[in-house]
């Protein structure tokens, strides 16, 4: 199977450094039925997610997650080839993404001096 095309870069909701240092929460990549988890749509990633190969980040901290990105990560996970997924954590035995918890983005904006 060939590598799926990388999804387009989406907008940043905040500075990468700010998202990375928030506590966040972990949400599984797949839902209870083993399908791409729609609960991730619109959430803000806290970590850099990089499949290797090719070694090009799919998500960076502060980036908004889209259905296309969720579908891409799911396809990569299901491929038979051995592709390392740097930044994707396992939580309760499930591959998960660390995303900003509710209220963290607003709290960041309130603290911002920009």
Residue map of PLM features:
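Non-catalytic terminal extensions of PLP-dependent enzymes
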Residues: 1-114
């Amino acid at each position: 199977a060939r590598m799926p095309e990388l999804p387009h870069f989406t907008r940043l909701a905040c500075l990468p450094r700010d998202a990375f240092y928030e506590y966040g929460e972990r949400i599984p990549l797949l839902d209870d039925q083993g399908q791409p988890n729609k609960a991730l749509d619109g959430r803000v990633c806290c970590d850099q997610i990089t499949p290797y190969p090719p070694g090009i980040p799919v998500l960076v901290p502060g980036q908004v997650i889209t259905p296309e990105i969720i579908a891409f990560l799911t396809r990569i996970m299901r491929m038979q080839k051995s592709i390392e997924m740097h930044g994707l954590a396992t939580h309760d035995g499930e591959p998960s993404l660390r995303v900003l918890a509710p209220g963290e983005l607003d709290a960041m904006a309130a603290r911002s001096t920009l």
